[in-house]
């Protein structure tokens, strides 16, 4: 799914163990920000640009990034504290739910972790009022908002020309 391959930092080759500590939260572009999405944080600008510009395969690229040998061989644990869940907007701001009983999610398997984390995110969204999730407070519900926000990211990474040529990012429902 990658035209130019994924560029990972050298430090990943130099380290012995990788422990991911992702949040359990909403994401304006991809719907959720869990463990697998953490791989994006390692990338150089050129890899991020390809990821967002050729958005028709963005979900597949997220999965591909987690199969890079360095990550696959060195990732030991994925650990999330589900005591505060970013239930709208994301990745940096939105409505935070603090459940009465929190949940700590830990797994050696990133897919298993993300399935539990996603279920926890969805469960905590069900208790929200309509006021907390309407309109611009949860833009992921609107296809126009998702594709426009992705073009803004492409513009920031590659410029106006790349933004004009960017593929449409299609949203997938979470709940």
Where are these regions (language model features)?
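Extended, low-polarity segments enriched in aliphatic/aromatic residues
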Residues: 1-175
């Amino acid at each position: 799914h990658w035209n130019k391959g994924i560029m990972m930092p050298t430090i990943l080759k130099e380290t012995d163990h990788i422990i991911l500590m992702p949040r359990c939260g909403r994401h304006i572009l991809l719907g959720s920000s869990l463990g697998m999405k953490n791989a994006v944080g390692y990338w150089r600008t050129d890899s991020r640009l390809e990821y967002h510009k050729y958005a028709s395969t963005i979900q597949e690229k997220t999965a591909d990034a987690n199969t890079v040998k360095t990550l696959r061989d060195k990732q030991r644990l994925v650990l999330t504290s589900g005591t505060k869940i970013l239930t709208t907007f994301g990745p940096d701001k939105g409505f935070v739910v603090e459940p009465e009983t929190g949940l700590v999610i830990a797994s050696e398997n990133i897919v298993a972790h993300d399935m539990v984390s996603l279920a926890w995110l969805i469960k905590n969204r069900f208790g929200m009022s309509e006021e907390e999730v309407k309109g611009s407070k949860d833009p992921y519900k609107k296809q126009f908002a998702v594709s426009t926000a992705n073009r803004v990211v492409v513009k920031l990474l590659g410029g106006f020309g790349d933004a004009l040529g960017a593929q449409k990012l299609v949203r997938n429902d979470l709940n």
